[in-house]
Amino acid sequence: MSQFDVAIMDYWSTSGRSFLHRAGPAAKVLMAAGFVAAVVTTRNVALLAAIYVTCVALLAVARVPPLKVMGIASYPAFFALLFVISEWDGTWQTPALIFGRALAAATSLVTLLATTPYPRVFGLLSRFLPHIVGEALFLTYKSVFMLLDMAGNLVTATRVRSGLQLRHPLTNLRNLSLATGKLLIHAFDRSEREYDIMVVRGYRGQIAAPERIWQGLASDALPVALGAAALAAAIIIRWNP
């Protein structure tokens, strides 16, 4: 996930006017939590597919481009491939379960962040978590993707300048060390600018929690019901196969 992906999700979450955008942050967090808990609990591929399809359908109704979101949510599938290689037992169910869990969990969280501005999400979490934990989660969310994007740009620039060559490993190490040092300098500079921007926007050492975490039964009932239904189905299938 690049910084562009984070920025476009911020745009979707703040510009949308659908029923899912209007729902309270607490309802959508509970929905995502229910989906993720169901993903962790179940070993049923059909239920994982149902959760994935439900998220895609919600995004389509919310007028968030589902294909773009599916692309963003597919990043964990590359990491899941490593588990497939190590855990494969010769059946199709094992890779389907691993990939299904990765895609369903990622799509659940992307659905939350694509329909809820992230300051409201982390502001809600700060009500229930220690102050330092909430702040750390908020800043980590922003900084990790920025650093990954910057690192990718530096590696690309180094390759274009013939700084990485298979026949010259020592030269590669030297160039990578220089690129890493440049990345650290840029990271410190970017962190200072981000802090200044947050101060201008009203940050005073604490993320402001949203005044209303619920928007009423009409707006919040469906997200909560979907999360609860997914978790209930996972529990029933797990203990009553």
Role assignments for model-derived ranges:
Residues M1-V45, I51-C55, N153-P241:
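Transmembrane alpha-helix interface motif
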Residues H21-P25, V45, P65-I72, T91, ...:
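Hydrophobic, aromatic-rich alpha-helical transmembrane segments
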Residues A33-A37, V56-A60, V84-W88, A106-T111, ...:
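Alpha-helical transmembrane segments of multipass membrane proteins
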Residues R43, A62-R63, G90, P130, ...:
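Short helix-capping/hinge motifs at transmembrane helix termini and TM-loop junctions
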Residues Y52-L59, P76:
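Hydrophobic transmembrane alpha-helices of multi-pass, membrane-embedded glycosylation machinery
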Residues M70-L170:
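Juxtamembrane/interface alpha-helical elements of multi-pass membrane proteins
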